[in-house]
Amino acid sequence: MRNKLIELVEASQLRTDFPEFRVGDNVRVHVRIREGGKERIQIFEGLVISKKESGTRETFTVRKISFGIGVNRTFPLHSPLISAIEVVRSNKVRRAKLYYMKNRAGKSARLKEIKR
């Protein structure tokens, strides 16, 4: 059983300004990057292959292919560094984790799109 004070503090940290997305969705994540004294927004677009944890510790992993090399990036969902998340496309999947997509390329890596 969790402490009520901890739950109260965590509830104030949760962000609700993001759209609902699932594993299998293609998303575009806008991340704030600080380089030197400047800050800019970098967009990372790819397939959500996993979602883990709950509450303030919730994370999701996005995979994309960049110049022929697969890149996985894990984001904390409630991080202040994430400025926006856009759902580009929703796909039909039957698994909670899509780690098998790491071994697929070309036509075998296709997923069936669903309308939401």
From Swiss-Prot:
| PROSITE patterns documented for this protein | RIBOSOMAL_L19
Write down the InterPro entries for this protein, in alphabetical order. Answer: Ribosomal_bL19, Ribosomal_bL19_CS, Ribosomal_bL19_sf, Translation_prot_SH3-like_sf
Q: Does the keyword Ribosomal protein apply?
A: yes
**The protein's role, per its UniProt record:** This protein is located at the 30S-50S ribosomal subunit interface and may play a role in the structure and function of the aminoacyl-tRNA binding site.
Write down the HAMAP family for this protein, in alphabetical order.
Ribosomal_bL19
What is the similarity comment for this entry?
Belongs to the bacterial ribosomal protein bL19 family.
Q: Please name the NCBIfam families in this protein's record.
A: rplS_bact (TIGR01024)
* Protein's UniProt name: Large ribosomal subunit protein bL19
Gene for this chain: rplS
